[in-house]
Amino acid sequence: MQDNYRLDKTDLAIIGQLSRDSRLSYEKIGSALHLTRNSVKTRIRRMVSEGTIQEFVPVLNYAALGYKTTCSIEIRETHSRDSITRKTIIDHLNRIGDIFLEIEELGGSTVFVLIIKESIDYDKIRSATVNTLGPSFLQNVFLRNSNSTIQPHTYMKPYILTNTDLRVLKSLVLDPQIGIAEMSKQLSVSARTVNRILARLKDGGIIEFSIILNPAALKGYVIFAVLIYVNEIEVIKKGSKRESLASHKVLQRLHNEFPEYPLWRGPFTGIDNEILVGLLGNDLTAIDSMFRKVQSFEEVNKAELHIFTKLVHHKDWVIKEIDSRLN
């Protein structure tokens, strides 16, 4: 790792492209940014080797695997003599559901995003967490019940996943960057079949692809996220995709009014009237000004600003779930 390595504006633009679709080819990214294929390839490989890009991630619609609820639990860990261990926290959360993401925030809080198979009561989760961890540890609990809330904004219509669909899905979870030819070889099916299934999974809102950045490697930058609650959920159709009209307007304004920020839609909320956008910034005063302006948008009901210090993505349980459906 080079001590003097710093991201430049071109790197940030590439990060923005990968965050929206990390399976984009070097050629497509280069075409969008007026760069050569080799330039894009070199920059991406450097960001991976320097640890800036922590992980390429699949973003699944877990409703397709039978899950019904998304639950975010915010816990503030302490370092006093009687503080509980991280293992105690993880063990408790695993009894509630499967941990999809851990997000450590500036200030000492950690948000755990859980995917749960059954519908579950807010009070039940809260009381169980307080009883296990103590009231001083629990900050917030957010539940998103019903199928519609776990479906991403691109969700079109459900369909039954075949064994071949599941095998393709497993390959993509294990390696989101796997090539079509390699997947075809691994699964002993034609490249045409793999292409068709992948297109159907993406168009049906079953899978998207993004990246996770390592905040510790972003010298001079911070990862911050704005969680935006829009005023209404009237839905429009964009081709085969559905999206809240207000959400669409807000996203357009963000792109148009803040072109200096590499902006991507976060994959970790799927509610029509919520938008989670991730950004990179190096000027806290400018970030605060940007956040205040977002709050003033007429389409915005309220907004929250979060600064991430560490992100951990869990996928072992997804592989086990897919395997259980294949057996």
In which residue ranges do the predicted regions lie?
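A compositional/biophysical signature of low hydrophobicity enriched in polar/charged and small residues
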Residues: 1-327
